[in-house]
Protein backbone atom coordinates (compact mmCIF):
# COMPACT_ATOMS: atom_id res chain seq x y z
CA UNK A 1 0.00 0.00 0.00
CA UNK A 2 1.05 3.59 -0.55
CA UNK A 3 0.17 6.87 1.14
CA UNK A 4 0.76 10.28 -0.42
CA UNK A 5 1.65 12.99 2.09
CA UNK A 6 1.24 16.72 1.47
CA UNK A 7 3.36 19.26 3.40
CA UNK A 8 2.05 22.34 5.15
CA UNK A 9 3.29 25.74 6.23
CA UNK A 10 7.04 25.77 6.81
CA UNK A 11 7.83 23.82 3.64
CA UNK A 12 7.49 26.85 1.36
CA UNK A 13 10.64 28.10 -0.33
CA UNK A 14 11.45 30.50 -3.12
CA UNK A 15 11.63 28.65 -6.43
CA UNK A 16 9.05 26.01 -5.56
CA UNK A 17 6.89 24.94 -8.49
CA UNK A 18 9.32 26.38 -11.03
CA UNK A 19 8.89 23.45 -13.42
CA UNK A 20 5.12 23.21 -12.93
CA UNK A 21 3.55 26.60 -13.64
CA UNK A 22 4.15 26.51 -17.40
CA UNK A 23 3.25 22.82 -17.67
CA UNK A 24 -0.09 23.41 -15.93
CA UNK A 25 -0.69 26.83 -17.44
CA UNK A 26 -4.51 26.69 -17.36
CA UNK A 27 -4.64 25.91 -13.64
CA UNK A 28 -1.99 28.53 -12.91
CA UNK A 29 -4.05 31.14 -14.76
CA UNK A 30 -7.18 30.08 -12.86
CA UNK A 31 -5.29 30.52 -9.59
CA UNK A 32 -4.07 33.97 -10.64
CA UNK A 33 -7.61 35.02 -11.55
CA UNK A 34 -9.02 33.73 -8.26
CA UNK A 35 -6.33 35.30 -6.08
CA UNK A 36 -5.71 38.52 -7.98
CA UNK A 37 -1.95 38.10 -8.21
CA UNK A 38 0.61 35.99 -10.07
CA UNK A 39 1.30 32.67 -8.38
CA UNK A 40 4.38 32.12 -10.53
CA UNK A 41 5.86 35.48 -9.54
CA UNK A 42 5.05 34.90 -5.86
CA UNK A 43 6.81 31.54 -5.78
CA UNK A 44 9.77 32.35 -8.02
CA UNK A 45 10.51 35.97 -7.09
CA UNK A 46 9.02 36.19 -3.58
CA UNK A 47 8.21 39.94 -3.80
CA UNK A 48 8.25 41.74 -0.42
CA UNK A 49 8.96 38.34 1.19
CA UNK A 50 5.25 37.60 0.75
CA UNK A 51 5.89 33.88 0.42
CA UNK A 52 6.47 33.74 4.18
CA UNK A 53 3.31 35.65 5.10
CA UNK A 54 0.50 33.28 6.07
CA UNK A 55 -2.13 34.81 3.78
CA UNK A 56 0.18 34.16 0.80
CA UNK A 57 1.93 31.02 2.05
CA UNK A 58 -1.22 28.93 2.30
CA UNK A 59 -2.55 29.52 -1.25
CA UNK A 60 0.96 29.13 -2.67
CA UNK A 61 1.59 25.80 -0.98
CA UNK A 62 -1.87 24.54 -1.89
CA UNK A 63 -1.31 25.37 -5.58
CA UNK A 64 2.20 23.89 -5.73
CA UNK A 65 1.07 20.75 -3.88
CA UNK A 66 -1.85 20.30 -6.30
CA UNK A 67 0.36 20.73 -9.35
CA UNK A 68 2.93 18.34 -7.87
CA UNK A 69 0.21 15.75 -7.31
CA UNK A 70 -1.19 16.12 -10.84
CA UNK A 71 2.32 15.81 -12.27
CA UNK A 72 2.90 12.66 -10.23
CA UNK A 73 -0.35 11.08 -11.40
CA UNK A 74 0.38 12.12 -14.97
CA UNK A 75 3.84 10.52 -14.86
CA UNK A 76 3.11 7.23 -13.10
CA UNK A 77 -0.70 6.92 -13.02
CA UNK A 78 -0.54 5.39 -9.53
CA UNK A 79 -3.39 6.42 -7.25
CA UNK A 80 -2.58 6.16 -3.53
CA UNK A 81 -4.41 3.91 -1.10
CA UNK A 82 -4.46 6.68 1.51
CA UNK A 83 -3.72 10.40 1.60
CA UNK A 84 -2.81 12.73 4.45
CA UNK A 85 -1.55 16.27 4.81
CA UNK A 86 0.08 18.23 7.61
CA UNK A 87 -2.23 21.11 8.59
CA UNK A 88 -2.69 23.09 5.34
CA UNK A 89 -1.60 19.99 3.40
CA UNK A 90 -4.82 18.27 4.46
CA UNK A 91 -6.62 20.40 1.87
CA UNK A 92 -4.43 18.83 -0.80
CA UNK A 93 -5.27 15.39 0.55
CA UNK A 94 -8.97 16.22 0.28
CA UNK A 95 -8.45 17.53 -3.26
CA UNK A 96 -6.67 14.29 -4.22
CA UNK A 97 -9.58 12.33 -2.75
CA UNK A 98 -12.10 14.27 -4.85
CA UNK A 99 -13.80 16.17 -2.02
CA UNK A 100 -13.60 19.41 -4.01
CA UNK A 101 -12.13 20.83 -7.20
CA UNK A 102 -8.99 22.94 -7.56
CA UNK A 103 -10.63 26.36 -7.31
CA UNK A 104 -12.91 25.40 -4.41
CA UNK A 105 -9.89 24.26 -2.43
CA UNK A 106 -8.06 27.46 -3.32
CA UNK A 107 -10.98 29.58 -2.11
CA UNK A 108 -10.96 27.65 1.17
CA UNK A 109 -7.24 28.00 1.84
CA UNK A 110 -7.24 31.67 0.83
CA UNK A 111 -9.89 32.40 3.45
CA UNK A 112 -8.15 30.17 5.99
CA UNK A 113 -4.85 31.96 5.43
CA UNK A 114 -6.46 35.39 5.69
CA UNK A 115 -8.18 34.54 8.97
CA UNK A 116 -5.14 32.90 10.53
CA UNK A 117 -2.89 35.79 9.49
CA UNK A 118 -5.03 38.20 11.52
CA UNK A 119 -4.02 36.52 14.80
CA UNK A 120 -0.58 38.09 15.10
CA UNK A 121 0.16 38.14 18.83
CA UNK A 122 1.17 34.50 19.17
CA UNK A 123 4.20 32.30 18.74
CA UNK A 124 5.07 28.62 18.35
CA UNK A 125 8.10 26.53 19.27
CA UNK A 126 9.24 22.94 18.76
CA UNK A 127 10.33 20.92 21.77
CA UNK A 128 12.64 18.01 20.95
CA UNK A 129 13.29 15.11 23.29
CA UNK A 130 10.03 14.92 25.24
CA UNK A 131 6.76 13.12 24.63
CA UNK A 132 3.50 15.06 24.41
CA UNK A 133 2.60 13.84 27.91
CA UNK A 134 5.93 15.07 29.29
CA UNK A 135 5.51 18.44 27.60
CA UNK A 136 2.01 18.75 29.04
CA UNK A 137 3.28 17.85 32.52
CA UNK A 138 6.06 20.44 32.27
CA UNK A 139 3.60 23.13 31.22
CA UNK A 140 1.33 22.35 34.17
CA UNK A 141 4.17 22.05 36.69
CA UNK A 142 5.61 25.43 35.76
CA UNK A 143 2.28 27.25 35.61
CA UNK A 144 2.30 27.69 31.85
CA UNK A 145 -1.43 27.04 31.59
CA UNK A 146 -1.88 29.45 28.70
CA UNK A 147 0.21 27.35 26.29
CA UNK A 148 -1.33 24.60 24.17
CA UNK A 149 0.17 21.62 22.37
CA UNK A 150 -0.22 22.44 18.68
CA UNK A 151 1.50 19.58 16.85
CA UNK A 152 2.48 16.08 17.90
CA UNK A 153 4.87 15.45 15.03
CA UNK A 154 6.72 12.38 16.31
CA UNK A 155 7.05 10.57 19.65
CA UNK A 156 9.68 13.09 20.76
CA UNK A 157 8.93 16.18 18.67
CA UNK A 158 6.13 18.35 20.01
CA UNK A 159 5.18 21.89 18.98
CA UNK A 160 3.69 24.29 21.52
CA UNK A 161 1.61 27.37 20.78
CA UNK A 162 0.72 30.43 22.83
CA UNK A 163 1.22 34.12 23.46
CA UNK A 164 4.67 35.46 22.60
CA UNK A 165 5.62 36.28 26.18
CA UNK A 166 4.52 32.84 27.40
CA UNK A 167 6.56 31.02 24.76
CA UNK A 168 9.55 33.12 25.86
CA UNK A 169 8.95 31.98 29.46
CA UNK A 170 8.66 28.39 28.28
CA UNK A 171 12.05 28.59 26.58
CA UNK A 172 13.98 28.80 29.86
CA UNK A 173 11.80 26.09 31.40
CA UNK A 174 12.34 23.53 28.66
CA UNK A 175 16.00 24.33 28.13
CA UNK A 176 16.47 23.53 31.81
CA UNK A 177 15.05 20.00 31.48
CA UNK A 178 17.70 17.32 30.99
CA UNK A 179 15.84 15.30 28.35
CA UNK A 180 15.16 18.29 26.08
CA UNK A 181 17.59 18.17 23.16
CA UNK A 182 16.35 21.37 21.49
CA UNK A 183 13.88 24.21 21.95
CA UNK A 184 13.34 25.82 18.57
CA UNK A 185 11.08 28.88 18.07
CA UNK A 186 9.23 28.66 14.74
CA UNK A 187 9.11 31.42 12.15
CA UNK A 188 5.33 31.80 12.11
CA UNK A 189 3.10 34.81 12.64
CA UNK A 190 0.62 33.39 15.14
CA UNK A 191 -0.28 30.76 17.73
CA UNK A 192 -1.72 28.29 15.24
CA UNK A 193 -3.61 25.15 16.32
CA UNK A 194 -4.40 26.56 19.74
CA UNK A 195 -7.18 28.25 21.71
CA UNK A 196 -5.96 31.57 20.28
CA UNK A 197 -7.37 30.58 16.89
CA UNK A 198 -10.94 30.29 18.19
CA UNK A 199 -12.08 33.53 16.53
CA UNK A 200 -10.57 32.46 13.20
CA UNK A 201 -12.28 29.09 13.59
CA UNK A 202 -15.68 30.69 14.19
CA UNK A 203 -15.36 32.88 11.10
CA UNK A 204 -14.17 29.93 9.02
CA UNK A 205 -17.13 27.84 10.20
CA UNK A 206 -19.48 30.47 8.78
CA UNK A 207 -17.54 30.57 5.52
CA UNK A 208 -17.67 26.78 5.16
CA UNK A 209 -21.46 26.72 5.31
CA UNK A 210 -21.76 27.82 1.68
CA UNK A 211 -19.69 24.90 0.38
CA UNK A 212 -20.78 21.41 -0.63
CA UNK A 213 -18.26 18.57 -0.62
CA UNK A 214 -18.26 15.63 -3.02
CA UNK A 215 -17.84 11.98 -2.05
CA UNK A 216 -14.34 11.09 -0.88
CA UNK A 217 -12.81 8.44 -3.15
CA UNK A 218 -9.60 7.79 -1.15
CA UNK A 219 -9.39 7.58 2.66
CA UNK A 220 -8.12 10.92 4.02
CA UNK A 221 -6.51 10.80 7.45
CA UNK A 222 -7.66 13.72 9.58
CA UNK A 223 -5.17 15.76 11.64
CA UNK A 224 -7.80 16.22 14.33
CA UNK A 225 -8.81 12.58 14.83
CA UNK A 226 -5.88 10.64 13.31
CA UNK A 227 -8.51 8.53 11.56
CA UNK A 228 -10.17 8.69 8.12
CA UNK A 229 -12.62 11.49 7.43
CA UNK A 230 -16.29 10.66 7.51
CA UNK A 231 -18.21 12.19 4.62
CA UNK A 232 -20.69 14.08 6.78
CA UNK A 233 -17.95 15.44 9.03
CA UNK A 234 -15.85 17.40 6.53
CA UNK A 235 -17.24 20.83 7.46
CA UNK A 236 -16.78 20.38 11.20
CA UNK A 237 -13.34 18.78 10.97
CA UNK A 238 -11.96 21.52 8.70
CA UNK A 239 -13.18 24.13 11.20
CA UNK A 240 -11.83 22.20 14.19
CA UNK A 241 -8.46 21.77 12.53
CA UNK A 242 -7.70 25.48 12.97
CA UNK A 243 -7.68 25.42 16.78
CA UNK A 244 -7.00 21.72 17.47
CA UNK A 245 -3.69 19.87 17.71
CA UNK A 246 -2.21 18.25 14.61
CA UNK A 247 -1.97 14.57 15.59
CA UNK A 248 0.63 13.70 12.99
CA UNK A 249 2.39 11.02 15.02
CA UNK A 250 -0.90 9.22 15.71
CA UNK A 251 -1.92 9.57 12.05
CA UNK A 252 1.25 7.90 10.79
CA UNK A 253 1.06 5.22 13.48
CA UNK A 254 -2.50 4.47 12.32
CA UNK A 255 -1.26 4.03 8.74
CA UNK A 256 1.72 1.92 9.79
CA UNK A 257 -0.66 -0.41 11.63
CA UNK A 258 -2.39 -1.11 8.30
CA UNK A 259 0.53 -3.32 7.25
CA UNK A 260 3.30 -2.74 4.75
CA UNK A 261 2.99 0.94 3.93
CA UNK A 262 5.08 3.16 1.68
CA UNK A 263 4.98 6.93 2.06
CA UNK A 264 5.68 9.50 -0.65
CA UNK A 265 5.83 13.22 0.02
CA UNK A 266 4.16 15.25 -2.71
CA UNK A 267 5.16 18.91 -2.77
CA UNK A 268 8.19 21.02 -1.86
CA UNK A 269 10.77 19.84 0.64
CA UNK A 270 11.22 16.69 2.70
CA UNK A 271 9.89 17.71 6.12
CA UNK A 272 7.27 14.96 6.29
CA UNK A 273 9.68 12.33 4.99
CA UNK A 274 11.99 13.25 7.87
CA UNK A 275 9.13 12.95 10.35
CA UNK A 276 8.26 9.49 9.02
CA UNK A 277 11.82 8.36 9.74
CA UNK A 278 11.66 9.88 13.23
CA UNK A 279 8.32 8.22 13.98
CA UNK A 280 9.58 4.82 12.86
CA UNK A 281 12.90 5.12 14.70
CA UNK A 282 11.53 6.64 17.91
CA UNK A 283 8.64 4.18 18.04
CA UNK A 284 11.04 1.23 17.71
CA UNK A 285 13.28 2.73 20.41
CA UNK A 286 10.31 3.35 22.73
CA UNK A 287 7.82 0.49 22.22
CA UNK A 288 5.73 1.60 25.18
CA UNK A 289 4.93 4.94 23.54
Curated annotation (Swiss-Prot):
> Which SUPFAM superfamilies does this entry report, sorted A to Z?
FabD/lysophospholipase-like, Probable ACP-binding domain of malonyl-CoA ACP transacylase
- Which example biological process does GO assign this protein? fatty acid biosynthetic process
- Reaction equations catalysed: holo-[ACP] + malonyl-CoA = malonyl-[ACP] + CoA
Which SMART domains does this chain map to? PKS_AT
The record's GO CC annotations read:
cytosol
Q: Which Pfam families would you find in this protein's record?
A: Acyl_transf_1
User: InterPro entries attached here?
Assistant: Ac_transferase_dom_sf (IPR001227), Acyl_transferase_dom (IPR014043), Acyl_Trfase/lysoPLipase (IPR016035), Mal-CoA-ACP_Trans/PKS_FabD (IPR050858), Malonyl_CoA-ACP_transAc (IPR024925), Malonyl_CoA-ACP_transAc_FabD (IPR004410), Malonyl_transacylase_ACP-bd (IPR016036)
Listed pathway(s): Antibiotic biosynthesis; bacillaene biosynthesis
Which function does this protein serve?
Answer: Involved in some intermediate steps for the synthesis of the antibiotic polyketide bacillaene which is involved in secondary metabolism. It catalyzes the transfer of the malonyl-CoA group to the acyl-carrier-protein AcpK (Mal-AcpK).
**What is the name of the protein in this document?**
Polyketide biosynthesis malonyl CoA-acyl carrier protein transacylase BaeC
Amino acid sequence: MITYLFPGQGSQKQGMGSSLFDEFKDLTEQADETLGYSMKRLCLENPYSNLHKTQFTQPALYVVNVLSYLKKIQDNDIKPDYVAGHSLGEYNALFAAGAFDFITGLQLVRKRGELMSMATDGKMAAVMGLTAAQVSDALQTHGLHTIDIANMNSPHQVVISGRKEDIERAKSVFEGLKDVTMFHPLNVSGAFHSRYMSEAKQEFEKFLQSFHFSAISIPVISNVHARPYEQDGIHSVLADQIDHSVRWNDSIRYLLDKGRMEFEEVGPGHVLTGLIHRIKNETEASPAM
